[in-house]
A protein has these predicted regions:
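Conserved glycine-rich cofactor-binding loop
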Residues: 8, 15-17
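Substrate-binding pocket helix/loop in short-chain dehydrogenase/reductase
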Residues: 102-104, 108-116, 208
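Conserved glycine-rich Rossmann-like NAD(P)H-binding loop of the short-chain dehydrogenase/reductase
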Residues: 29-46
Length: 209
C-alpha cells in the first residue's frame, strides 16, 4: 500500500487546484504536509479541511505562507518547516505564474521575467535548499509540476510553455546528479484541468478542440 506515515512534505501553491489535491492525498496517506501559498487565510481553510479528514489517522497539515518570488520567503518556508516538523522528506514544487495570454510578440518584459522567476528560478532555489539534507540522509523525493505545455507548442501561452520545458530539464539534471544518493526527482506534466489557473484555456472552445 502507498504509505507516507512519518514523512513530511512541502507543497507550494497548495491552497487550491492541483496543489490542494496533492496535499490532501499525501496527508490522507499519512504524511505531515505544509500547505503553502501567498494568502495565509486560503491556506488555513485547506489545512483545516485536511486535518478534519485526517483526524483518525497519522496525516496532518500545517500552514506556512510563502511568496515564491521572494528568495527570503522561500528560505523561511524551508526553515520553518524544519522547525515545526523536524525534516523535509518531500518537496512538491507546484506554484507557478502565467500573467500573460497572447502572442509572444506582445508579452511585456516584466511579465516574461515573472514567469521565468516564479516557474523556474523558485523551483531551483527550493531544490538547492532541501537537497543537501536529503543527500545526507540518502533519501528524499522532489516532484516538480511541469505541464503538457512543456512538451508541446502554443500560440497563446508560449512563455509559460518555455518555463515548463525548462522545469523538465531541471528535473532530468537533478535526477542525474542526485539519483545515486537516493534523492528521487520527477516531473508531472498535467494536461488541461478546470482550475482557476487555467481558466483562460478551458473557457475557450477553440483551444478545447
Amino acid at each position: 500500500m502507498f504509505d507516507l506515515t512519518g514523512k513530511t512534505a512541502i507543497i507550494t501553491g497548495s491552497s487550491k487546484g492541483i496543489g490542494k489535491s496533492i496535499a490532501t492525498q499525501m496527508a490522507l496517506h499519512g504524511a505531515k504536509v505544509v500547505v503553502s501559498s501567498r494568502k495565509v487565510e486560503a491556506c488555513q481553510i485547506v489545512a483545516d479541511e485536511i486535518n478534519e479528514a485526517c483526524k483518525d489517522s497519522e496525516g496532518e497539515a500545517i500552514v506556512i505562507p510563502c511568496n515564491i518570488s521572494d528568495k527570503t520567503a522561500l528560505q523561511m518556508l524551508v526553515d520553518e518547516t524544519r522547525a515545526q516538523l523536524g525534516k523535509i522528506d518531500i518537496l512538491v514544487c507546484n506554484a507557478a505564474s502565467n500573467p500573460f495570454f497572447g502572442s509572444m510578440m506582445d508579452i511585456p518584459e516584466d511579465a516574461f521575467d515573472k514567469v521565468m522567476n516564479n516557474n523556474i528560478k523558485s523551483n531551483h532555489l527550493l531544490c538547492q535548499m532541501v537537497i543537501p539534507e536529503m543527500k545526507e540522509r540518502k533519501d528524499g523525493s522532489i516532484i516538480i509540476v511541469s505541464s503538457i505545455g512543456g512538451l508541446q507548442a502554443s500560440t497563446v501561452i508560449g512563455t509559460y510553455n518555455i518555463s515548463k520545458a525548462a522545469d523538465i530539464m531541471l528535473v532530468k539534471n537533478l535526477a542525474a546528479e542526485f539519483g545515486p544518493d537516493n534523492v528521487r526527482t520527477n516531473a508531472i506534466a498535467p494536461g488541461l484541468f478546470k482550475t482557476d489557473f487555467a481558466r483562460a484555456l478551458w473557457e475557450n472552445p477553440e483551444i478545447l478542440k
